[in-house]
Amino acid sequence: GWRHRVYAFLAQGWQGTDRQWRHYKAAYLFLAALAPPLVISVHSVVSWDFAQSIVPGWHSTIFAPYFVAGAIHSGLAMVITLLIPLRRIFRLDTYITQAHLENLAKLIILTGLIVGYAYVVESYIAGYSNNVPEWQRFIYQVTGEYAIPFWIMILFNSLVPLLLFVKRIRTSTPWLFGIAILINIGMWCERFVIIVTGLAHEYDPSSWGLFIPTWVDISITVGSFAWFFLWFLLFVKHLPAVSITEVKEGATADPLVGEHP
């Protein structure tokens, strides 16, 4: 059917020869080595889009590592959020083991500590710089109308991940899934706090105000989530959720891999 034609086109003449496997593994390693600097460069550039402005709360040199750590932190949480239901629904326990989830949890501990450090440095800069608008914006951020998203950000992104130091929690799938959901919420609040509080409390008091989302804002936000999950579910439905290459490599290394009771 149409799937066979699509897969044949995407295979591009793949026959599984020894030469093709060697080229595949070389390309695989190259792309794996390319990914980390690409992530760092992309999110650093995005952060500098903010840091190059003079908006209080944005003009900070901490933004580059802050954004990189935050991107990895939220990315790990989203991977766990998607991986755990996928593992359960499709019974992929053989390929996605508890060890994989525990290692992801350990990485979340690391990125959570880095993000927490960035929060501390950000508050320190606001107080130490003797910049009155910067300090006023920080106080407004902590105690003003948007204090709830700020404290949710601090709690969910920095303090909740510390629970993963406990091995019993780190190896518990429900606990891990719940913590990942909270981190996703916290990272969304972080983006909200960065953008809204900075623009709501700038230099000119006459421009101060509250951001009240309209139906357009809400529709765009909900539509973004719907768009992502639409393509994710279509991918899971029509393409292998686990790389067949890695499944075959695992089966070659361990004949028991792939067998189900």
Predicted regions and their residues:
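Extramembrane terminal tails and long inter-domain/linker segments of multi-pass membrane proteins
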Residues: 1-26, 98-99, 201-212, 221-261
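Long, contiguous internal "core" modules enriched in hydrophobic/ aromatic residues
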Residues: 1-153, 166, 248-249
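Membrane-interface transmembrane-helix boundary segments in multi-pass integral membrane proteins
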Residues: 61-70, 132-154, 161, 172, ...
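Alpha-helical transmembrane segments of multi-pass membrane proteins
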Residues: 115, 183-187, 233
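Hydrophobic, well-ordered secondary-structure elements that form the walls
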Residues: 117, 161, 191, 240
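C-terminal TM-helix exit segments that contain a strictly Trp-centered aromatic cap at the helix terminus
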Residues: 118-125, 187-197
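Membrane-helix interface "capping/anchor" motifs
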Residues: 165-176
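Central hydrophobic cores of alpha-helical transmembrane segments
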Residues: 175-185
